[in-house]
Each structure stands twice: as structure tokens, then as C-alpha cells.
Amino acid sequence: MTMFKTTFRQTATIAVSLISLLVSPMLWANTNNTIEEQLSTLEKYSQGRLGVALINTEDNSQITYRGEERFAMASTSKVMAVAAVLKESEKQAGLLDKNITIKKSDLVAYSPITEKHLVTGMSLAQLSAATLQYSDNTAMNKILDYLGGPAKVTQFARSINDVTYRLDRKEPELNTAIHGDPRDTTSPIAMAKSLQALTLGDALGQSQRQQLVTWLKGNTTGDHSIKAGLPKHWIVGDKTGSGDYGTTNDIAVIWPKNHAPLILVVYFTQQEQDAKYRKDIIVKATEIVTKEISNSPQTK
């Protein structure tokens, strides 16, 4: 019995040491390593596939990791769908006030807002807010129905010079995130450039752009994702996403103190279909790519 206890204790010590060796590289963000090396270490630790794109609008410099590779968007795809509605509202006064009927048969999994409006219906503005701020899946589907289907969102993406984004399915099917499946995917850098164009550029009219930014700033699902990896006084507008294979995503517009805005996209997926979500990886990737700016005296 004594021998077993000693052996168990030694084994446990060795196990803890090995875990420390694996975990500590993720926690230290060694300044002697390049950002790419730090992200690579994080990816190896996570045993998944990580995609990152950061655009610093102060000088338009970029940091990317697997930036050109395709990743399942999951609910981050919703930003483009809502933007497509906003674009149409530029030509149709009062469009956002248009009431959309919601039937019980329309409801799909995770619809915390739309399920409360089966009698009254919701305006396109309300559906857009529910889509972005609560990731309501039925709201997304009603927006897609109004636009004419997922292909219309892809068409809108092309109109703002995004040749990578593609939306093929509705909720919840768009979240299957099967490895190698190009459906409902984009690349981190393509999404970052589109998010920049939509929120800071001229892809939308001024009032539509301001509305999109307001909705993103009011997101309720992002407190433990990109936002958690940033100084608390920075302003963030984001859209999270999750799906099969532990797909864990977040895309954000970030306003650091005394600094031009940042655009950050972090996509992450894993090998097992039922893998757990890893918001900790999103947080750590955020810390790595924004460390230089967050440590600057002017942004503190």
C-alpha cells in the first residue's frame, strides 16, 4: 500500500510537471518569441486549428496566423447578413420598421428573443438586434428569408469586394463546421477586411454604419471572448460564434484608449465533433496579438 501511494504521488507530480510544461508556454507569452511563434505554441497546446487576423487601422498593418485559410464562420456570419439588410435600407426608407411575422414552425434551436414574439412579430430592426446581440437563430433565418436566402448574403459580400465569404445554409445547419467543407466559411483576413469596411469604411451609409456599430457594441454574448483579453476600459463591439468540432469564434471592432480602432478576428476549431468550446484560446490569442498596443503608455 505504501509503495502504491509513493508511486501514485510520484506519478501525479510528473503529470503536473508535464501539464505545466504544456500550459506555461500559453500563459507566459514570451517576449523573446515572435507573435507567430506564440500563436503557434498556443495552437499546439490547444490541439486544434487557430486562425487570427488583426488590422491596426492606425497604419493599416496586419498580424495574421493562418489568415488565408478557410474556417467555419458559425454565427459570425450574421454580421454580413444584417449588413445586407442595412444596405437595402439605404434605398428603402422605413425598411427597418417593416414587421415580419414569426410562426411557431419558424422557431429553431436557440431563439431566446423571437420565441417571445410569436403573436406580435418583429421588425427587421428588432430581428437584426436579436441576431447580433443575442445570436438568435430564428431571427437570423427570418432575415435570410427576407433577403432571399443565404446566396443573397454571399452576393452582398461580393459587392463589398469580399471574394472569400460564402453563406450556403440557414441556422442551425450552418454550424456543422465539418473539416474541409467549404460551406459557410471564410478566412480570418477576409472577414477582418469586411468588418473594417462595414464598421469603419464606406461599405454602408453613415447612419447604417452607426447602427451596425451600435448593435455590435450591445452584444451580450462576448464578455468571455475577445473582450476578456483586452484592457477593461477599451470599447469593444463583437459577434461570437460556435459550432460542431468545438468551433469557437469571435470577430470584433476594438477602440483602444487614445489609439485608432483595431479589427480582430479569431477562429478556432478542433478534431472531435463533440469537443468543448475553448473561449480561453480566443482570450489568449487576443492577448498575444494586442500586447504591444495594450502595453503602450498612451492606451493605459
Curated annotation (Swiss-Prot):
Residues 1-29 form the signal peptide. Changing residue 286 to A: In strain: 5E78-1. The active site is at residue 75. It holds the Pfam family Beta-lactamase2. It catalyses: a beta-lactam + H2O = a substituted beta-amino acid. Its EC number is 3.5.2.6. SUPFAM superfamilies: beta-lactamase/transpeptidase-like (SSF56601). Substrate binds at residues 239-241. Gene3D superfamilies: DD-peptidase/beta-lactamase superfamily. Changing residue 40 to N: In strain: 5E78-1. Keywords: Antibiotic resistance, Hydrolase, Signal. Hydrolyzes broad-spectrum beta-lactam antibiotics. Active against cephalosporins such as cefuroxime and cefotaxime. NCBIfam families: bla_class_A. The class A beta-lactamase family has a specific amino-acid numbering system, sometimes called Ambler or ABL numbering and often misspelt as Amber. A multiple sequence alignment was used to derive a consensus sequence and then the consensus was numbered taking into account insertions and deletions. This allows use of identical numbers, e.g. for active site residues, despite differences in protein length. UniProt always uses natural numbering of residues, hence there appear to be differences in numbering between this entry and some papers. Monomer. This is Beta-lactamase. It comes from Proteus vulgaris.
